[in-house]
A protein has these predicted regions:
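Accessory RNA-recognition modules of RNA-modification enzymes
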Residues: 2-253
């Protein structure tokens, strides 16, 4: 006879799971015969058919095959790439419930984990929960015979090539588009994770809410950066906002 919390699922098999909670990083939590199963993109109130992809001693992870009953927290993401892109974890959850989840997460971190008995005041939400992210990091790669730049696909290192992100500050979107086009025009070679060739690993862009100044950081494999001066000159012309440009060397293989 299985004891509560003992393994009752098998890798590769599909189970009907009612989602009752969420982890700190936004994965749904359900149980199969009292054995915890974490399900990415699932929300409390969902009932899903999910295929188990890994089994540990005290929990398993599964991916949604089909949503049988939709949670009242679930919405259709506005972004058409949300299904694949790893840039947003809760694009499928309505904003009111996002705030409630974050509120509870802070309360649990302080009261249950930190043993600090204190009252957490309600989170002050935004009137429009878009355009607020003032720092983004974009991996750079090569696909379909061209340089690509965007966000890693969920659970992979495949890059979702994009030109716009709704939650980023508009100036980051503008700078992002300019940087990608200039890198393509100058034929700067992206870093290749397989053979460790190429130069550009990531581009980090940050904007100040105070004066709208931009900071652009090129994370490179080596100090040698072909077309570096040309790149800076082109960006200076493309971006009228005050901008600073840095190079961060990461030679780690």
């Amino acid at each position: 006879m299985k004891q509560p919390g003992q393994q009752t699922v098998n890798k590769g098999e599909t189970y009907q799971i009612e989602i009752t909670d969420m982890t700190h990083d936004g994965e749904g939590v359900g149980r199969v015969d009292d054995f915890a199963v974490f399900v990415p993109e699932a929300l409390p109130g969902d009932v899903v058919l999910a295929r188990v992809i890994s089994v540990k001693k005290t929990y398993a992870r599964a991916l949604i095959e089909k949503i049988l009953t939709k949670s009242n927290q679930r919405i259709t993401p506005v972004c058409q790439k949300a299904e694949w892109c790893g840039g947003c974890q809760l694009a499928h959850m309505d904003y009111k419930h996002q705030l409630a989840w974050k509120q509870r997460y802070v309360e649990e971190a302080l009261n249950r984990l930190g043993k600090i008995e204190t009252k957490v005041l309600p989170i002050i939400g935004m009137e429009n929960p878009e355009g607020y992210r003032n720092k983004s990091q974009f991996p750079v790669g090569f696909a379909d015979s061209k340089l690509v730049m965007g966000f890693f696909q969920k659970r992979s290192h495949q890059i979702v090539d994009t030109d716009h992100c709704r939650i980023q500050h508009p100036l980051i979107n503008k700078a992002f588009q300019s940087v990608k086009q200039v890198l393509r025009d100058l034929r700067v070679e992206p870093y290749n994770e397989i053979n460790h060739s190429g130069v550009i690993r990531h581009v980090v862009i940050r904007v100040s809410f105070c004066n709208h100044a931009l900071m652009i950081v090129f994370v490179t494999r080596t100090d040698d950066f072909p077309h570096r001066d040309e790149l800076i000159t082109c960006l200076t012309k493309e971006l009228p906002e005050p901008a600073s440009v840095y190079q961060n060397i990461n030679s780690k293989v």
